[in-house]
Regions:
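Pre-signature/interface helix of ABC/ABC-like ATPase nucleotide-binding domains
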Residues: 1, 33, 118, 155, ...
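Conserved AdoMet
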Residues: 1-23
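Conserved Class I SAM-dependent methyltransferase catalytic core
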Residues: 2, 170-233
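Residue-level signal for the nucleotide or nucleotide-sugar donor/cofactor binding architecture
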Residues: 8-12, 63, 67, 140, ...
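Conserved SAM/SAH cofactor-binding pocket of Class I
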Residues: 16-84, 93-95, 99-102, 106-109, ...
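Class I S-adenosylmethionine-dependent transferase superfamily signal
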Residues: 21, 46, 157, 179-183
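C-terminal beta-strand of the catalytic ATP-binding
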Residues: 144, 233-236
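Mobile active-site "lid"/loop adjacent to the S-adenosyl-L-methionine
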Residues: 144-174
Length: 236
């Protein structure tokens, strides 16, 4: 994946989330949302590897969405079209992706993948997500580093990755609290959330989800054996 100073560098940790969703949902008839998409690595990987029917990727940063669009084009798509309306098509089967970008209509990027689709949407969390739109799965790798810790991070992270994508507020849990509440409004009954977490946040995030009404909470470890993803189901 291409990256710049506007997005996080994709890490092996995030593969844990992608691999688990692919394992849990082999069926293609799935509506999925990736909140805080950044470079688009999660959403694009799930759209292509999972072949899912409908994937939406959301980020507050217009610059980040430009990177995600670039990745969609560079990794999977060949470009056709005019200055006002671009279309993209995957050059290899079986995906046959045709992606149309409506440049004159704001930040929404609509990709048509035959019966599947990929959408990039600029939004401050769920603000621009229509209230009646529901999903089967919502995934997120939100900012989760406590504010006071950021200045002590490795220079390659602190100085070259956007603070917007790192800073999880005072205790690092701000976005999990918001997501736990907002995701429940957009999940179909029985739908699941998958949140990437810091290695020491599993208990706190699990508690947040429990209080918000989620059930079947599971902590998933990454390859080195560290807590990396929390999965939970919404049954209301």
């Amino acid at each position: 994946f291409s990256v710049d100073e506007n997005v996080l560098i994709p890490r092996q940790d995030t593969e844990t989330l992608v691999e688990r969703v692919l394992r849990d949902y082999p069926e293609k008839d799935l509506k999925l949302l990736d909140m805080c998409t950044g470079s688009g690595c999660i959403a694009i990987s799930l759209a292509v590897l999972g072949g899912y029917q409908n994937v939406t990727a959301v980020d507050i940063s217009e610059a980040a969405l430009r990177v995600a669009k670039k990745n969609a084009r560079r990794l999977f798509l060949i470009q056709k079209g005019t200055a006002r309306s671009e279309s993209f098509q995957v050059s290899e089967d079986p995906w046959c992706i045709r992606l149309k970008t409506w440049l004159a209509k704001g930040p929404r990027l609509q990709a048509e993948i035959e019966e599947h689709s990929l959408t990039l949407l600029q939004s401050n969390l769920f603000q621009a997500v229509e209230a009646d739109v529901m999903y089967d799965v919502i995934v997120s790798n939100p900012p989760y580093i406590p504010s006071a810790v950021i200045d002590g991070l490795e220079p390659e992270v602190r100085d070259h990755e956007p603070r917007l994508a790192l800073d999880g507020s005072e205790d690092g849990l701000y976005f999990y609290r918001v997501l736990a509440l907002e995701c429940s409004k957009h999940l179909n009954k029985g739908g699941c959330v998958y949140f990437e977490i810091g290695y020491d946040q599993a208990e706190a995030v699990s508690r947040i989800l429990t209080i918000a009404g989620y059930r079947e909470i599971e902590v998933i470890k990454d390859e080195p054996g560290l807590d990396r993803v929390v999965k939970a189901r919404w049954n209301r």
